[in-house]
Amino acid sequence: MPGTKIELKTGDDPDPAPYLFVSDEIKKRIAEKPYDPKRSCYVPHPEEKFCEGMIEETTGAKVQVKIVKGSWEGKTDTFKQELVTQVNPPKYDCCEDMSNLTYLNDASVLFNLKMRYVERLIYTYSGLFCIAVNPYKRFPIYTMRTVGVYRTKRRNEVPPHIFAIAEGSYHSMCLSK
């Protein structure tokens, strides 16, 4: 019922932080990632959809790319220039809101969602929308302790989560009485 006080009991609730916040370990790994703004790119791949690569040579409308990540790692191939897309700087890896990405293309969106999923960060914003990638596992992110993280916080003050959306909706509803 609206306006009802909920008692927050955190005794048996596990810490949701590893499933909500980008850890220092992840940030360190991202900072060490090699990146060349002129050569780093994504290219299409039949199974993985996109692979990261480095542009080695451009000849007219053809681009020679050495794959640096994925099942083709180490392989060099030639692609049409329109199929080669730019990679965001590493500081945008595991980005909480994809509307902040420098290069907003299919590969960048899929890469960011995949990276967050691998790190067990299943919620991501895309502007006004909250994207959830279902891990088909139970994470301790729907507990009273997690509710406490999001209670009375604005969406930009906490990591992406459906509770942030709910809190914003509740706050707006209370203001528009």
Predicted regions and their residues:
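N-terminal entry segment of cytoskeletal motor ATPase domains
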Residues: M1-K177
